[in-house]
Amino acid sequence: MMDRDSADQSSADSTPIEPPHSNAPSGPVVVSVCTTCKTADGSAVVGPEMFASVRAALGVGDANVVVRPVQCLSVCKRPATVAVTSPDGYTFLFGDLQTESGTAALASFVKSYLKSNYGLVPWRERAEVLRKGMVARVPPMRWSPDDGLAPK
């Protein structure tokens, strides 16, 4: 288990992270960064800066992670907004992210996401900025509606 200090730190190395077991998310983790987010008072667009920062932190060329710009995640009252998802994993939507602290937290979160069952990073292992900025956690598409338990 990762302690909180290591969960709040990130390393920008370019070594691909391999999922350790079959319940880890398959396919790439997709990090979608809203590029139309503005400051709360609407005076400045902060999305492009967040996108550039997240892309730099997570690296380019890692087949396990894709960072993409999106025009709107419809969480306009909580800029900057970022979604993290994978084909068979949970989707997380975070808001209220500042470029520096949010980027470091997201880099650490994505590494943990890749190693967690279905991308479900335990709450206590998430950086405080992500715990406070949580907008939504959506279960994987293969979620069982009959019993509500995690996919098997």
Regions found by a protein language model. Give the residues of each.
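Short flanking/linker segments adjacent to small metal-binding domains or redox-active Cys/His motifs
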Residues: 78, 83-89, 107-152
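Generic structural "secondary-structure junction" signal
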Residues: 75, 96-99, 132
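Short, charged low-complexity linear segments at domain edges
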Residues: 2-18, 42-61
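Polybasic, low-complexity association/targeting segments
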Residues: 3-37, 146-152
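Ferredoxin-type iron-sulfur electron-transfer modules in oxidoreductases and energy-metabolism complexes
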Residues: 47-65, 96-101, 106-109
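Immediate flanking context of iron-sulfur cluster ligation sites
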Residues: 20-32, 51, 55-75
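Local cysteine-cluster metal-coordination motifs and their immediate loop/turn environment
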Residues: 29-44, 69-86
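Intrinsically disordered, low-complexity regulatory segments enriched in Ser/Thr/Pro
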Residues: 91-95
